[in-house]
Amino acid sequence: QRSLVGSEMCIRDRVFYSAYMPVSNHRLLPAPQSFRPPLLREHRLYQADWLLRFYHFRAEELLDEANPNFNPLVDPKCSWALNHPEFFPVEVNRADYEALLRVPGIGVTSARRILVARRCAPLTFAGLKKLGVVLKRAQYFLTCGGKYLEGLRVSPDGVLRHLVAQERPMLAQGAPEQLSLFEQTG
């Protein structure tokens, strides 16, 4: 959590994270071949840092006493959304910029495009897709004209299962391996 607080203090500065990689064969350290670095945690730290710098989240919103660690199954923004059902659904035709940024599947560019496009006409889910919104994540947290995406029949408990199923191909590829500076490759 210190890393998150540190990156929040210097909004414009870039923070770099690195999983521990033993490089010595000293007997008091884990053997390099037996130790798998927590690369997924490193990835989640970068995602959280991005939320702090560009999406106006605060560190205590991402990690708290009830959720002291990142969910390894979904990204920090999806995890926040699942832990705050009272915030959703967000009505895309009335929500302000800050509310749009908290919806999984809506990024900074898409949120700005939504604000511009809805001045001309009410937005639909088809229109959101054209604006670059990732509906496979956003559909669970948005309404257009007070209605959910047609055909969406998912209970709140089922949302996590659906989001995990979408990320499963990435997680099922096996644990990523850190490239070595010392070994020659092919």
Task: Please describe what each predicted stretch is.
Residues 1-6, 10-11:
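Single conserved hydrophobic/aromatic residue that forms the stacking wall/gate
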Residues 69-99, 125-186:
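C-terminal extensions
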Residues 117-118:
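Residue-level signature of tetratricopeptide-repeat
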Residues 48, 114:
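Conserved, mostly hydrophobic/aromatic
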Residues 13-39, 55-84:
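Flexible glycine/acidic-rich beta-alpha junction loops that bind and position SAM and/or redox cofactors
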Residues 37, 41-47:
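Anionic-ligand-binding alpha/beta catalytic cores of soluble enzymes and soluble regulatory domains
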